[in-house]
Amino acid sequence: HYPLRRQRQMCIRDSNKIERPAVPLPIRLSAIDPICLDILYNRGIKTPVEMEEFLFPSLTKQLRAHPPLLDMDKAVSILKAVVANKEMVTIYHDYDVDGVTAGVTALSALSQLGVPVNHYCNDRITGGFGINAAGVDEIVAKFPDTKVLLTVDNGIAGIEGVSRAKELGLKVIITDHHEPGAKLPDADAVIDHKRVDESARQDKNCCGAGVVWKLMLELYIGLGRNVEPVMDLLDIVALGTIADVVPLIGDNRAIVQEGLKRINSGARPFFQMCLEVLEKESIDAMTVAFRIAPMINAVSRMGGDASKLIDLFMETNADDLRAGIIALDDINEARKEETRRETELAKELVGKAPVGAIVFNHESLQEGIVGIVAGQLKEEFSLPAVVLAKDKDGNWKGSARSPEGFMLKEALDQCAEYLISYGGHAKAAGLTVRAADLDKFKEKLTKLALEAAGDKGFEVAIPIDAVLGAQDYTEDMVRHLGILEPFGEGFRQPLFGLIADNITGVRYMGTEEQHVRYQDESGLQVIQWNKGDEAKARKAPPKKFVGYPGLNVFRGNTTVQFIAE
């Protein structure tokens, strides 16, 4: 059995005990705080050349490092004819951030070539994920002049939907990044870096927006056009890349670095208005991940029409943009409250000691936010979590999330006999369980999770990058850490251990004193959110913390803060 909240231990990876060898450094590296280089070294980025390529990636060089994706030539050939003949393309996109940004990417790039373009998105609740026959029929009815159907961030599992499109005489191009099944859809081109026959040299980490962006780039190059309009879309692609939690390495890191520059350049009115509404001076990867992306995802989660988001991204009127983004923020706040209620219900019904895997189903659950609830249960219990809501057919439809050490997609493959449909990755998946087989599914998944966990359970120790004293956290050190950005999946924000032997003051913050601030004699402030009650119960302030340093600017004065768990 696993307790409700296993205490996460402050530990240092074995690799962090390796001292970085003293070697001559290029000028750009020699100017960086050594702690940054130590972090890179102990994360496997060891040589000066590797460090420079990681910190200062060249997107052009990254793209040239691997061959074009399979069927890219076929797709480009079809789209060249579309451009020449001004044939209508309808984009079939997903309803999450990656799907929406992939839709914006394709629509913008094709529109600038004079192609008549429409876009279509399933309703999250009634239509489900990916191209299907009903969606194709609706497209043909709504956009009868459609000649080419372009899927973005979906399609690799859409055998039925693609078959229907072909029956109706449409050409179909699939661009996707999800895991394929044993059989590929019968499309005219299937672009997915996870195809089993793809090159081993291929970068297999791109999100849906990244895949279709590469197609648009190849199209412009093939047409002999200036590629700057495609490069201008990197801000949109960066948003999709960060939001879809794909590893920020390789192509993705270069895309996000360049994309964040463009986001903060002021070129796109949407992001300029985000700065105003969210009261931010700049937008980094963390702002995208925890503020902007959730607002966009909230629309479909709360039953809204995600296809309208594409129009908002392309809006230029300041008043309409402001109203639109404020509305997104309001929807997201409602989503947060609904998520809080449903997560509390789940924890109450699951109990304090779930075994193996959590499979939680309840008729009151809102289908649009089951993925978030699953993610919170996974974090709370450090176990694979599946959360299911009853669908219109009486079956159980929902989402799954998994901690390190449990390959979710592979586990679902072994449970396929109980599932009507499923798809996803190692850490996240969507699925529909046949009502009659729910108990069998729970039993099978729990058994697989117990086997994977073994005696030790799933890893919950915090990998600390360095342990420092309070006096070591200086303003210069914190500013230098910024060069390691962007942080995200595959390259998380550095975590530090803080040894604070000389706490001189404690102050409680918030309307209910729910937060606490410790003052070290060095001047360093240690902030813990929502830990006020724990702090009051202590006989003395803690001497060890885990977290990350940051800068606080108040009335023109800059101080260093340590944000602790």
Which role fits each region the language model picked out?
Residues 437-444, 512, 538-565:
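OB-fold single-stranded nucleic acid-binding module
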Residues 137-205, 209, 213-222:
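Active-site cavity-forming subdomains of large catalytic enzyme subunits
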